[in-house]
Every structure is written in structure tokens, then in C-alpha cells.
Amino acid sequence: MKQIFIGIIRFYQKFISPMTPPTCRFYPTCSHYGLEAFQKHGALKGFWLTCKRILKCHPFHPGGFDPVPDKKDDKVNS
């Protein structure tokens, strides 16, 4: 499932994004953020993080540096 989403993002980056002017307000761009989110967190959480990011990418948000959060360790420290 994760590979399907990554494939969709790569298709967008290669074929759709070059035909449009750069409009992303963030660094890394939303598509790069999505790739990293899926690679770090898997399909479910990667999808959630990517959707949240895309919804923030509009003219009324200041944008800026917004990295993908690190994956939290599921182990409880003893």
C-alpha cells in the first residue's frame, strides 16, 4: 500500500508538477514531505500526515520550514 502512494507522488513530481508554477509555501515541498512521511511512517500515518500538510498549504498560512516528525519509539523505557 505504501508503495502505491509513493508511486502516485512520484508520478505527480515527474509529470504534473513541472507543468505548474511552484506554489508550495513550505520547505520541504508538500510532495517531498509526503514521500518522506510514507517512507518513515508507513501507509496509514504517512497518509494522515500528508493530508494534514496539504490542507495547511494555502495562501493564508505563512508556510516555512515544516519537517516530517520523527517516528516515535514504541518501546517503553525501563
Swiss-Prot record:
The keyword Cell membrane applies. SMART domains: Haemolytic. One of its GO terms (cellular component) is plasma membrane. Its main location: membrane. It is found in: Cell membrane. NCBIfam families: membrane protein insertion efficiency factor YidD. Could be involved in insertion of integral membrane proteins into the membrane. Belongs to the UPF0161 family. This is Putative membrane protein insertion efficiency factor.
